[in-house]
Amino acid sequence: TTLERRRQLKPLGDKAPLLSRRLWESWWCRESKFNDDQILPFKGFIEDMNTSLSKVGRALGHRVWQSIEYYMSNYPDVLEAQRNNDDASLVKAMKVAFEDQLVQKVMPKLRGIETRGKSKSDSLDKIRTQLVNDDYTIIEDFDLACEFGYGQFIWNSANYLNESDSSVETEFRAL
């Protein structure tokens, strides 16, 4: 990674008006609008992962799953695809939102699992296989967490963000 210099601090533009609570709440989705065919593959993924975690005395609870589903329900690209009745975009957006939640909610629960022996073969290897089979972009980060944690799983990278959407980076650089 090449670090960029900032030679001059530029003043911020005019202060934007505060977002009203009413407007914010109008954006908030209070119910999951996914049908079973849409959400069950993700729920099944977490349940299968939970089976692997049980081999090392770990588990993901109902609240973890519920927070994942509601994060996905409120993800802007998911909401947009639902508004436009665009099934292809919905599937893609759901996968991106779910992958965010794997990193934010699930991977921290794996911290400290031993990366060798039975813990690796009974749990981490099975989880890795799930990630590979469903073509998630966090595999490199998962491998790094297994490799560089001094014998323990320690998630410490976000390389998947570089791969997931280069158009965002292009937009950001244009600013």
Task: Name each model-derived stretch.
Residues 1-175:
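C-terminal regulatory/interaction module of P-loop NTP-utilizing enzymes
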